[in-house]
Amino acid sequence: MAGTGSSRRTFMAGAAAGAGALTAAGAATATAAAAAPAGAAATAASPGAAGRRVAVLGGGVAGLTAAHELAERGYAVTVYERRALGGKARSMDVPGSARGGRRPLPAEHGFRFIPGIYHNLPDTMRRIPFPGNPNGVWDNLVAPREMMFARAGGREDLRAPIPWPGHSAADLTPDELRRALGGILQTLVRLPLHETAYFLDRVLVFLTSCDERRDEVWEHTPWWEFVRAAQMSAEYQRILAVGITRNIVATKAEEASTRTVGTLGEAFVFNALGCGADGPPDRILNLPTNEAWIDPWEAHLRSLGVEFRIGWTVREVQYGGGRVSGVVASDPAGTRQTVTADHYVSALPVEHARRTWSAGLRAADPMLGRCDKLETDWMTGIQFYLTERAPLVHGHLNCIDSAWSLTAIQQAEHWPSRDFPAHYGDGTAVDCLSVDISEWDKPGILYGKTAKQCTRDEVAREVWAQLKASLNDTGRTLLSDSALHSWFLDPGVNGLGTPHPTNEDELLIHPTGTLHNRPSAGTRVPNFFLSGDYVAVDIDLATMEGANASARAAVNALLDRDDSQAARCTVTPRYRAPGMEAARRHDRWRYRLGLRNVFDVG
């Protein structure tokens, strides 16, 4: 197996499919009202913003969103980024892969997924110009029609359409239809009816729980315990307990907060019902991420006057005189310099940001110290380049039985404006199978080692073997060794196979109690603000939507501190079904009396 390259929010489409099963629980109380799209923020600059300088520390989705909102309001913004703009969301080139005037093969930390439950990020996308698109980058979103739970051990796969008006069913051959029905029937046989009924009851308990019960009880209850997985069948555990946690948010079902998992599931139920959605439950970009989104965003921000310092590493946020007095950063040559501004927005991932907070800064706001309790884990991508397109599902696939919790999507068919072999690589690769690895601490099937214990080459071979075990196990060969051109593993992962592997791009996870350690965007330090997917916002998940919403909240806090007359950023909350409010009010009354939810039978 040829490796390419040097010595990846995540997939939530499993929840979109799961929402189809859960829709029955929500349909009785859901309304068909849809929330209006978030309005674009006003671009009029604040009279007091002229000459006010803001240093944005980090150039991922959070940092670029903050820069966007601030620049529209007349602030002089400089973004400091250590590696490349876009952060974990960016796509990248495979070094040395271009031939004959083509572009390098496209790679990424992990494939992008922008579901209809997002509102703030799509609003920003609409405000980024893209040639020929009346709605800017937002028009580059496309919606796969189906997804699949790929089963191993000779089990037929579960292939499901993604419900949305205008979606037509995939054209299935008689054999594909037989296999799809076989997968459903095999699951029905193994998943007892009473267990399905119990799970739907638990869904109803969560949907009708008041906010207080969610925040104070379900936040401290592991999902595994909430759905009583230990008392259920292996099929129940695999699909309903583990399948919609580990493969979605890189969080173990035994530890994941019920509030987080339930909130995500609830959002997808109503998205599938067409309530309060920006679009279909599953959306992806119609080009590699930088081509479709990040590069146009950078160009637009530069047109607004934003300056970028690429290759600058933030070392320490200094504190003095009751304010942030400056930021020590290393320039591309390694020389330490002190950056000064009127305001500072920390938009680094939490595991990097908290290392930069000086002792004085932490003492000024104890909230920063609580961020040390936030946990991260590995979720990283690998891409396989194929010389023949594999006959896979036309959307995301979730290898639900795989040891390393693999999710994947074959990308070329979703990039209609690109002839893959004509545009990328050496002309022989025709597609990219992009895979996210969510489990790095369990033994694989090929070497009996964890992903962290494997070398880069062993990781690639192991992932390929696990994919084949899930896809080639029912008498068909969907992935062929002869069609494998090369592979590329996220360069943010280093030291694999050594005692001390590292990952520069870990993902925030959500064990019980996480909610209460999330900080607010505004701090007690008058010129210091936080932006990132770890900041407390309405969507309780490490997502690009959370990063975007937190940046808007940070900018609003900054505008308040400046007594600015500029319009505040719109921060659109998750959809709340009006039909559920009466049940939630009743549950609030019961909760305050110390009673269970009325649907909670234990």
Describe the role of every protein-language-model region.
Residues 559-601:
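Active-site-proximal substrate-binding core of FAD-dependent oxidoreductases
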Residues 318-338:
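Conserved beta-strand-loop-beta-strand element in the redox core of flavoprotein oxidoreductases
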Residues 71-95:
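Glycine-rich FAD pyrophosphate-binding loop
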Residues 52-78:
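N-terminal Rossmann-like FAD-binding beta1-loop-alpha1 element of flavoenzymes
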Residues 195-323:
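Active-site/ligand-binding neighborhood in enzyme catalytic cores
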Residues 99-198:
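Dinucleotide-binding Rossmann-like beta1-alpha1 core, especially the glycine-rich loop
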Residues 274-285, 328, 341-343, 348-518, ...:
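C-terminal segments that line or cap access tunnels to active or ligand-binding sites in enzymes
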Residues 1-19:
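N-terminal secretory signal peptides and thylakoid transit peptides that target proteins
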